[in-house]
């Protein structure tokens, strides 16, 4: 039997998501439903789904049961621990729909609690800062894309990343690069990995492209921008700093500290509707 549910469509630096409000936790969102909804020809189309639910209703959640929980699913139906762009859009939705009372609040994720600050917001657009936690540098590894080997820094942001700073790579050459699914060290990354190709730090800025596990290339990846900033700073011999990260979908600001990191960037809610699943 077909089920009709409300949805919203939004994006954060063109990393796009379907928001499914499920405050009463009545929807059994299966992987098959996710794949169908995220299909860009037969469905609504998105890089993933953000289900809005209380942490108390999420199996395996380890956060405060009273928190709103970002139940994030990749476009292939798999569960994902964390999504920095998704958190900004999720926070925008909660605040603009009066599901929270303050501009500063916590959100539950499978990677733990993320604190957010709404810097500006209306029903359609917002600027949001997210406390992304301490980047966990896991070591050095490599990947192969189209027969070219890239060396990178393993960074765990609640989800796994391999951020590859490429010496001498220009922003224009990066834009022209043919990016395909990478092969990687499966012992180093047993649960798969998101791969970022990054230019060297110049004038406190880098350019980045990303291949996300379970999705493919996306226009942006929030956790990936933090991993990229961390790798670029390390490549430049720096332990902390503020980095503008330029992605195909726009720009974000990443701050890396000794004891944490933040991600600041835009969010947009572009459509509301109903869909049969």
Curated annotation (Swiss-Prot):
Pfam family, one: DAP_epimerase
Top-level taxonomic group: Bacteria
Keywords on record: Amino-acid biosynthesis, Cytoplasm, Isomerase, Lysine biosynthesis
Ligand binding (substrate): 15, 74, 84-85, 159, 194, 212-213, 222-223
Entry annotation: catalytic residues: 83 (proton donor), 221 (proton acceptor)
Recorded GO MF terms: diaminopimelate epimerase activity
GO biological process, one term: lysine biosynthetic process via diaminopimelate
EC number per UniProt: 5.1.1.7
InterPro entries: DAP_epimerase_AS, DAP_epimerase_DapF
GO CC terms, sorted: cytosol
Subunit structure: Homodimer.
Name recorded for this polypeptide: Diaminopimelate epimerase
Organism: Corynebacterium glutamicum (strain R)
């Amino acid at each position: 039997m077909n089920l009709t549910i409300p949805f919203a469509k939004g994006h954060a630096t063109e990393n796009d998501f379907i928001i499914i409000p499920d405050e009463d936790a009545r929807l059994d969102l299966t992987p098959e439903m996710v794949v169908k909804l995220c299909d860009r020809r037969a469905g609504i189309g998105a890089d993933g789904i953000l289900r809005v639910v209380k942490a108390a209703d999420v199996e395996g959640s380890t956060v405060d049961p009273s928190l709103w929980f970002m139940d994030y699913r990749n476009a292939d139906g798999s569960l994902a621990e964390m999504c920095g762009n998704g958190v900004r859009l999720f926070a925008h939705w909660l605040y603009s729909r009066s599901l929270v009372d303050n501009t500063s609040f916590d959100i539950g994720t499978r990677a733990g609690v993320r604190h957010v600050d709404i810097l500006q917001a209306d029903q359609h657009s917002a600027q949001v800062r997210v406390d992304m936690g301490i980047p966990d540098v896991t070591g050095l590894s490599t990947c192969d894309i189209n027969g070219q080997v890239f060396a990178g820094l393993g960074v765990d942001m609640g989800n796994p990343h391999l951020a590859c700073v490429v010496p001498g790579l220009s922003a224009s050459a990066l834009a022209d690069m043919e990016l395909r699914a990478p092969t990687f060290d499966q012992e180093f990354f047993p649960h798969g990995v998101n791969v970022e190709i990054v230019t060297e730090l110049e004038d406190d800025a880098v350019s980045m492209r990303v291949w996300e596990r379970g999705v493919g290339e996306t226009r942006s990846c929030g956790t990936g921008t933090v991993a990229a900033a961390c790798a670029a700073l390390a490549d430049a011999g720096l332990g902390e700093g503020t980095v503008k990260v330029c992605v195909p979908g726009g720009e974000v600001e990443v701050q890396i500290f000794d004891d944490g990191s933040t991600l600041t960037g835009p969010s947009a809610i572009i459509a509301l509707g109903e869909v049969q699943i």
